[in-house]
Amino acid sequence: MSTKKKEAVIGKESLAHKGLLRTITLVSTFGGLLFGYDTGVINGALPFMATAGQLNLTPVTEGLVASSLLLGAAFGAMFGGRLSDRHGRRKTILYLALLFIAATLGCTFSPNASVMIAFRFLLGLAVGCASVTVPTFLAEISPAERRGRIVTQNELMIVIGQLLAYTFNAIIGSTMGESANVWRYMLVIATLPAVVLWFGMLIVPESPRWLAAKGRMGDALRVLRQIREDSQAQQEIKEIKHAIEGTAKKAGFHDFQEPWIRRILFIGIGIAIVQQITGVNSIMYYGTEILREAGFQTEAALIGNIANGVISVIAVIFGIWLLGKVRRRPMLIIGQIGTMTALLLIGILSIVLEGTPALPYVVLSLTILFLAFQQTAISTVTWLMLSEIFPMHVRGLGMGISTFCLWTANFLIGFTFPILLNHIGMSATFFIFVAMNILAILFVKKYVPETKGRSLEQLEHSFRQYGRRADQEIQNQTTHLS
């Protein structure tokens, strides 16, 4: 075969590899789309379902309806990591698609607040499990040089899901607002992407790293050859084999007795909580309520809330581009400074401009500024780093524990926000978030490492080396004291 023909064949194979990788990414990130829609739709549905004759919600039950999904997501994240480690990333996502469909229908036809809270909890199990499994799956199929952009496409689909929720809320609320069951129409739309996810995952291959961890090296290499050039696949399977030597045992909590793994878990939990204590989901879940509190009417607040969704999508696209240019750690710190500034201004100007016609527009502008920093830097980096830092044999469990903490923090914020807003007002509530942002910046500066440009196996080796150095220092100190 001539050189030109060989190059043509290689070029076609390369296009086929990239095409399949894009298909896998698109299909699996429908889990992220559902995550976004199901967390965002409550933003516009709450004012309608809270009314007399519907679910008759009080501030407490309103908080429970919004946050029961988050509590479910915490447990879904915890068990989802173990489930995906045991049954595989692909099969777990297939199960999740069915749970998304069943729980969404349960929420849609809920006759009272208690049933709604129960089905929102079940929906949360699916959301939490997806929040662990999908980024892990994407990280494990991605080449190191493209991992950042591929994994953060899940974050893009999350905010697209939220934008779709806000848009459908505004359209349905404006055109069918007189209907008693308008909120049910908002909720049931989520069954459509769940059906797409289920059918799509039937044609997607399993994670090669999960297959290798189960001793199925031949299957792992076969999958890698579908999404990599042959030489790259061969090199990658060697790295994977080397990484799992001596770690073929079943993952369990006993693994966290090792100091280097315990340190990674500490960092993972910290990163997860940092993402939440910015207060982002108080805006994503209660944006309509915040704008009503500032002075907008319900219909205007629903429409204004679309701006939050649009800026989130634009910001994540920009963040994905930035990840190819900028290191993770500086992005995270700059994002935190930006969100803290926006929250501080909301708190101050809500006092200065209280009762004026300008206040709702100022609050809307500042929430857009807040989301620009949050979605460009913090949210994109959070999910990416959580999928990167854990070693292969505890990746599902470690990410599950970290994401459990993320959703627990999310639940606490989601539940307490409407209560705080009702009792201490908007300004004081946002000042609390400013204080928590300061603590978050200090944590990132002290503990969070840089992960850009390194394979998952190289990161694991680096953490192991750190652990050995720490052990040696402790041993030297013990020897010196004795």
From Swiss-Prot:
Disulfide bonds: none annotated. GO terms for cellular component: membrane; plasma membrane. The chain crosses the membrane at residues 30-50, 60-80, 93-113, 121-141, 156-176, 185-205, 264-284, 302-322, 332-352, 353-373, 401-421, 424-444. It is found in: Cell membrane. It is a multi-pass membrane protein. CDD domains: MFS_XylE_like. GO terms for molecular function: D-glucose transmembrane transporter activity. The keyword Cell membrane applies. Residues 1-29, 81-92, 142-155, 206-263, 323-331, 374-400, 445-482 are cytoplasmic. The keyword Transmembrane applies. Keywords: Cell membrane, Membrane, Transmembrane, Transmembrane helix, Transport. InterPro entries: MFS_dom, MFS_sugar_transport-like, MFS_Sugar_Transporter, MFS_trans_sf, Sugar/inositol_transpt, Sugar_transporter_CS, XylE-like. Residues 51-59, 114-120, 177-184, 285-301, 422-423 are extracellular. One of its GO terms (biological process) is D-glucose transmembrane transport. Belongs to the major facilitator superfamily. Sugar transporter (TC 2.A.1.1) family. This is Putative metabolite transport protein YfiG.
